[in-house]
Amino acid sequence: MEASGERAAVVRRLMEVKEESGKTFSEIAAETGLTNVYVAQLLRRQAHLKADTVPALRAALPTLTDELVQLMMQPPFRSYNPDIVQEPAIYRLNEAVMHFGESIKEIINEEFGDGIMSAIDFYCSVDKVQGADGKDRVVVTFDGKYLPYTEQKSEHMMSRPTRKTS
């Protein structure tokens, strides 16, 4: 587990590498075949860099050091600073999910049944589009695998010892 100070120092270094490249998250994403949000997650140490992605990321970010690559390839300690919820853009995203969440849940249940959207087998992207009025609009896409809740039958519980009956 990374200490928060150590993680912050690594994130600062990674963001400096991005800054030196002069590229946006979306430009790096286009060069690496990743989503723009996943690139941001990698550079914020919220995602695990896979070995087969290293060459493309190195090409996109030429000043990325071996040391940083090695750190990025370690499973991260995924967390967030609770104070970040106060940041206006994050606050509004949270507000939107809370406001629309109950309706979204109902539609998931109607379309799929009793279950949830995975945040593990999950893709996320942020895109800029022009609205009908010609003004810029933000499109946030959450693309998660559907996971049905299971009926908990004891016969399917593999960790439960088999009971012998007399």
From Swiss-Prot:
GO molecular function: cyanate hydratase activity; DNA binding; identical protein binding
Active-site annotation: R92, E95, S118
InterPro entries, per database record: Cro/C1-type_HTH (IPR001387), Cyanase (IPR008076), Cyanate_lyase_C (IPR003712), Cyanate_lyase_C_sf (IPR036581), Lambda_DNA-bd_dom_sf (IPR010982)
Pfam assignment, any one: Cyanate_lyase
EC number of this enzyme: 4.2.1.104
One example of a Gene Ontology biological process annotation: cyanate catabolic process
Record keywords, A-Z: Lyase
Catalytic activities: cyanate + hydrogencarbonate + 3 H(+) = NH4(+) + 2 CO2
Class of the enzyme per the UniProt entry, highest EC level: lyase
NCBIfam families xref list: cynS
Similarity field: Belongs to the cyanase family.
Protein purpose: Catalyzes the reaction of cyanate with bicarbonate to produce ammonia and carbon dioxide.
Protein name, per record: Cyanate hydratase
Species lineage: Eukaryota, Viridiplantae, Streptophyta, Embryophyta, Tracheophyta
